[in-house]
Amino acid sequence: MAEDKHGMLRHFLAALAYRTQKALREAPSDFADFEAGNLTRTPRELVQHMTSVLGYARTFFRGGSYRPEPLPSLEGEVERLHEMLADLSAHLAAGDPLVDMTPEQLLQGPFSDAMTHAGQLAMLRRLHGSPVPPEDFIVAEIDRANVGEDQASPRSPDREWPEELP
């Protein structure tokens, strides 16, 4: 995989880590098991699913299969998600070859799927009555070497978009 492609994929994973942490930062304690209705996943289930999707992506580097068992807490699920992000980022940084998948397919499939779920976490925060503060993500401090839980604070909070529910 060319350096520019795997560098961009690592940046995408770092952006995923950032947006996931933004959606979870300062969430109320009962958010983990919030049920929006109509069989939607809870935040804890969403994070588990994100790890599962990314674990599937990892099989194209390592082979095998990946089906994580549910963990009892959102904190445990989040920790496992960031471990998966770190492992994928390490494969990309090392230039490990993908098997039966292109970098573009990795992006359009499991990586984009996981980012969609980060957005769902943010939407669930609003439905829960605790909206995520808006910000201009173009200037967010995203470092492709940082896919951990400790993400930067917003550089440019959007002061013109209402944060409070009507």
Name each region found by the language model:
Residues 6, 10-24, 31-69, 98-166:
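Short, contiguous alpha-helical
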Residues 59-97:
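Helix-adjacent hinge/juxtasegments
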